[in-house]
Amino acid sequence: MKLIVGLGNPGRKFKKTRHNIGFFVIDELLQRHKWKLNNSKFEGDYSIEHFDGEKVILLQPQTYMNLSGKSISPLMDYFDIDVDDVIVVYDDLDLPTGKIRLRQKGGHGGHNGVRSTIDHLGTKDFKRVRLGIGRPTNATPVIDYVLGKFPKQETTAVTDSVEKAADAIEAWIKGKPFLEVMNDFNQ
């Protein structure tokens, strides 16, 4: 069983913000396969699906970003999911908008949702898909920037990166070794 977690903030207010690009990827996978998040438990909305012979859970924590681990850890425990079978998808200020980067494991890099995930799982050893959102180019505080919406001129780059991230996740679910997926999709 695989667990795909998109990090973001719940509610309409945050729906199209940079910080919610992890949710965008889950939404892309749901739309591609006509799946729905039809379960609400573990402080998250999730769906249990089958893809290419593999059971897959897609999760959008509803805890707000900084508490994401509170949703992920109990769901993993309940379904007995090994950390090797988890991918966490989230925004990255240090990558330009439109770029994606996959990692086998690592630190939180200042990302509070990832920090919470590490704290609750007790390990840094989970796979990640990071989607670039760039940094503010003016004096905009980082918190205002990540909670802001993408400008229209970035729509194509964002859409492309979300689709590539979904493609990478699907390749991994189908059984391609994660290191090969990294080689194929890292930009």
UniProtKB/Swiss-Prot annotation:
It is found in: Cytoplasm. The keyword Ribonucleoprotein does not apply. The keyword RNA-binding applies. One of its GO terms (cellular component) is cytoplasm. It catalyses: an N-acyl-L-alpha-aminoacyl-tRNA + H2O = an N-acyl-L-amino acid + a tRNA + H(+). The active site is at 19 (proton acceptor). It is an enzyme of class 3 (hydrolase). One of its GO terms (molecular function) is peptidyl-tRNA hydrolase activity. Pfam families: Pept_tRNA_hydro (PF01195). The record marks 91 as: Stabilizes the basic form of H active site to accept a proton. GO terms for biological process: protein quality control for misfolded or incompletely synthesized proteins; rescue of stalled ribosome. Keywords: Cytoplasm, Hydrolase, RNA-binding, tRNA-binding. Its EC number is 3.1.1.29. This is Peptidyl-tRNA hydrolase. It comes from Oceanobacillus iheyensis (strain DSM 14371 / CIP 107618 / JCM 11309 / KCTC 3954 / HTE831).
